[in-house]
Amino acid sequence: MHRTAALSIAILTAVSCGSGCTTRPYEQDYQQRVADFRGAAVFAPLAQDPTEFGNGRVALRLPSVLEPPKEDDGTKIRVLPPFVRQFPGFVAAYEKLIVMSNNMQLPVVLTIGAVPVAEQRFSEVESAILEQVRRDESFPKVDWERGRSVEPMAGGPAMWDVLSLSGPQEFDSKPTGEPEIKRWPGRCEIWVSADPKQEVCTVLALRAPDDVADQLPVTVTELIELAARTVQPVAAAAVEQPADAPAK
């Protein structure tokens, strides 16, 4: 090979390597920015930061549309699903009272529980929930969908068991005054974390009447799945006794 040709090849190789070495970090940074942007867009219906409940037993990003329940005569009725009055490890509930065209208000409610596995395994939690739900006239034959896989964003549980309940169910349809409990077509999803290595079993229940569900940023199923993906693991040292659930 002529010296001139060899020199040209060497120069081209150096230029190509230099260009590749220069652009590769930029491309990686760009791809990471795109991934971060897409992730932020997916979780846009949730608050930016997680909220801790039950003295740190569970932490997750709440749906931003929800807020602490208003204190009135119907609060204790609304914060728990009517078919799970004994809610395992109850720690908190958040709600949104949505005004309908006739000025009636209907609640969308997220109920949160945290059960240390040293006290009760997730399979026992599920049995306790299912036994109660099947007593409701709308759901006598429902059963768990087991092994719903999600991609956790904070190292939390990747496996959940899900109870999907669509049909007439009780809602407080007049939460600004005397409670008026009526059966409305609605949807409730109950998610129980089923990670075999978890130290705390997280229980999430999201309910919405069909008449106001379209005012949520995404569907009930999508919203509770997003929240479940943000559940953060809890150290055993932080686990304490669960809070008492509201009175029946």
Language-model regions, residue ranges each:
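Short, well-ordered beta-strand elements
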Residues: 109-112, 188, 196-212
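N-terminal targeting sequences that direct proteins away from the cytosol to non-cytosolic compartments
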Residues: 17-98, 150, 176-180, 203-248
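Signature of long, low-cysteine stretches enriched in small and polar/charged residues
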Residues: 25, 119-193, 244
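A short acidic-to-branched-hydrophobic micro-motif
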Residues: 86-131, 203
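Envelope-exposed proteins and targeting segments
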Residues: 56-58, 62-64, 106-108, 186-188
